[in-house]
Amino acid sequence: PLRPDSVYTAGERFGTIGAIFGPYRVEITTYRGEWYSPDSRKPEVTFGISLEEDLSRRDFTVNAIAMDIPSGRLIDPFGGVEDLHSKVIRAVGDPDARFRDDPLRLMRAVRFAANLGFRIEPRTAEAIRRHAAQICKISVERVRDELTRMLTGPAPDVAIAALVDLGLMQYIVPEVVELKQVSTGGGKHKDIFIHTLKVVRNTPPDLVIR
């Protein structure tokens, strides 16, 4: 049998242990889900009883696909493979419930869509708008990490525009939203916001520069 070089158990109370096989790090997790109570920034973890129940708690259909390793058979109860082919970001089941479970998913939807060149399907997009203020429940460190992945990704301008359009940016960096109200005073661009998007698009993927 394959034996790991080392095992770490830092996430054991959340149902996760890790194993390292040479250069590869593998996380082994039991069936579980996470949700945020209205007055807390820390997630509550609940353990499930079946694979389908576990997949039903995932954020988007493209992330709710499993594989039976011995046979190679895909387990795809929510149409994730079809959405992958169609380049669609779609919440699993009820989008309102998915974003209540973990409001960071509001930003993850934007990041996946921008970085992968996908589109957010309408019901999911409308739910993001409804729950945008809930991003304030998430720790600043997690919000920072998501924003960093967008800014250093292949389409930071698309990500920024989507954050503004979906109502998230006003809770993250509200000064960016205010750029839409500033004119360049007869320059080439309609407003400073459009100019900023063009600049970000054409700079190297360095966080300090972008």
Residue ranges and their predicted role:
Residues 1-210:
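Catalytic cores of the polymerase beta-like nucleotidyltransferase superfamily
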